[in-house]
Amino acid sequence: MYKLLNRTDFINMENIREDLEYYIKKYNFDGIELIKFNESDNTSVKEYIKGYHMRFFPSWFELYTGNISALYEELKDKKYFKSLCGGEESKEELIDYYKKELEIAKELEVEYVVFHACNSKVTESLTYNFKYSDKEILDGVISLINDVFDNEKYNFKLLFENLWWPGLKLLNKEEVEYLFSKIKYKNIGLMLDTGHMINSNYHLKSSKEAVEYIKRNIDNLGEYKNYIYGMHLNYSLSGGYVRKSIEENRDKKIDIEDLMKRIYIHINSIDYHDPFEDEGIVDIIKSLPIKYLVYELIAKSDEELEDKILRQDRVLKKFKIF
């Protein structure tokens, strides 16, 4: 099992090797899972990059299906399309973006790539009144991934990650079975995000309840739990915040300009990526064929990140996971 740390390419390229070597050596990581937001060339540190997280455009579905009028109806202004949808005019922009990402992943010689198999309109993140069903989004994911991979052959695994919005939630085997049966690329598996799974039930009130909930869902996957090759290990318990957001916004006219100014604060309040410190997580890790255990933590400073790494290490080292 690899112990990995998630990192973005926001770091200055002159300092990226120093940054990666610091965390890898000090905390005994085997490497990183990279998510890219800029055009920097990361091949100089590719020996440290085990996985590549494909960019997530949360509202991609209507761009992909050509429902541009629905995007204007919600977002009012085209200036938001690219960051939320992956393009401004047509699905070809989104497909081309992801094709380029696969070429980057190939150049970096990563072992796996991760894709968020879900969609949410930005206002739905406040109200939880979702326009599209899980099945509709999964059908979109299948079509998009088949377009992007386009019968190309790569050496890396494609891991589908669960979220709490419409799409893949990993709550039952039927959704996984359906997804896997339609994807043409066959070197596939699952990336279980523990925080995302907790987020899918905003009635959970404690880490103990969260652990039991994750265990039940894994049991519900049946034989498909054997495809969980990766785990994004983190913890969020934000049900109280979510319930309040739903109550305050479901019957309210939402100002999109105001929402876009605070959307990242809102999402981080739901999915805040703390360490998973309940020792019950250890049995879950041991029950799965995980090869890539990723500390996926969010921090506002290096000091906060190191504190979170230490807190996560404390739990896993106690039970000799590493």
Language model segments and positions:
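Short amphipathic alpha-helical segments and helix-helix/interface helices
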Residues: 17-24, 40-43, 102, 145-149, ...
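Hydrophobic faces of well-ordered beta-strands that scaffold small-molecule active sites
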Residues: 1-9, 30-34, 48-54, 113-115, ...
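N-terminal pre-domain/capping segments
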Residues: 1-100, 318-322
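Residues lining hydrophobic/aromatic ligand-binding pockets adjacent to catalytic sites
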Residues: 23-27, 32-34, 126-138, 144-145, ...
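Aromatic- and acidic-residue-enriched segments that line the glycan-binding/catalytic groove
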Residues: 61-72, 131-132, 247-253
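Active-site acidic/histidine proton-transfer and metal-coordination neighborhood
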Residues: 87-189
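Histidine-acidic metal/acid-base catalytic patches
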Residues: 1-2, 22, 95, 99-100, ...
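Acidic-and-aromatic substrate-binding clefts and catalytic sites of carbohydrate-active enzymes
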Residues: 10-16, 29-45, 57-62, 92, ...
